[in-house]
Amino acid sequence: AYRRDIYLEMGGFVKRAIFNEDMIYAGSLIQEGYGIAYAADAKVIHSHNYSCMQQFHRNFDLGVSQAEHPEIFEGVPSEGEGIKLVKKTIRYLFRKGKIWLIPGVILQSGCKYAGYLAGKKYRKLPRKMILWCTMNREYWKDL
């Protein structure tokens, strides 16, 4: 939830963002001295059941977003946090005796990471490849 008065004062979400408009807005709030609260008791239902290729495309857009907004994401350790999550998930699956799920976690994570890295380097890619990699082709129409 956002305070409407501050949202309007700050100009709302960035006008052009492929992904992460909420994080970009939150980062700009923090830079202006406002706070962001974590509500541990908040109930949110948000789920995706993406295939490996869909994960690649989604994380490509995530990488593009981070590359386009270094003022927000420069100090964010996305890769390190992702690796920690993968390791934690694999340990959990071992403890629960569900080791047959581990190859899927590794494959999904590899697709996410490959997409993310490609997105971070999108400026070096040919347009045709960018259009293949993105989940949001509309974003690239006017570029």
Which sequence ranges carry the predicted segments?
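Conserved nucleotide-sugar donor-binding
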Residues: 1-11
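A conserved hydrophobic position in a structured secondary element of the catalytic/binding core
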Residues: 2, 21, 39
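Acidic donor-binding loop at a coil-to-helix junction in glycosyltransferase catalytic cores
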Residues: 18-25
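Hydrophobic residues within well-ordered alpha-helices
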Residues: 29-30
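Active-site-adjacent helix/loop segment of glycosyltransferases
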Residues: 36, 45-113
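Juxtamembrane C-terminal module of membrane proteins
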Residues: 85, 115-143
